């Protein structure tokens, strides 16, 4: 799913999601299911402030439709604020970031892989973990441990 900025959304218990968003220092909480903070207090709501930030236009469908492919990138979202692709790998792959002027984030959703950057630094990344590459990284070698599925995001 892709919800543009200004859309009211809620995340249910037990969901594993990647919430990729544009840079912002503001989050408005308009309802909090009566949850309590660590001290037992209900968290502050921002109902009045949120009224000016909500995008009230209606979309028919927020699903991100794509055709799943193995061993090649599949574009999910490209907007003015970020681009996100999904990789479903059963084979090793080298990713070229030499033309990209941005940091890159990989979020491993399934399986695991070892990533090695162009400086020779290697890190194993497992499902539920993420890794941030500096904008100076020009190439990343992904060595799959059987299978790895991850999101790639950059600005």
Spans of model-derived segments:
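Ligand-binding loop in jelly-roll beta-barrel domains
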Residues: 6-26, 135-155
């Amino acid at each position: 799913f892709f919800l543009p900025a200004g859309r009211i959304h809620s995340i249910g218990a037990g969901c594993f999601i990647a919430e990729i968003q544009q840079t912002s220092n503001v989050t408005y909480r308009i309802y909090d299911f009566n949850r309590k903070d660590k001290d037992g207090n209900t968290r502050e709501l921002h109902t009045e402030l949120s009224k000016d930030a909500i995008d009230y236009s209606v979309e028919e469908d927020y699903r991100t439709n794509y055709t799943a492919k193995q061993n090649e990138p599949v574009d999910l979202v490209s907007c003015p604020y970020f681009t996100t692709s999904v990789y479903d790998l059963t084979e090793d792959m080298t990713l070229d970031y030499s033309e990209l002027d941005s940091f890159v984030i990989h979020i491993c959703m399934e399986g695991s892989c070892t990533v090695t950057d162009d400086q020779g630094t290697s890190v194993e990344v497992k499902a539920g973990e993420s890794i941030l590459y500096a904008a100076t990284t020009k190439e990343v070698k992904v060595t799959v441990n059987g299978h790895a599925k991850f999101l790639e995001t950059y600005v």
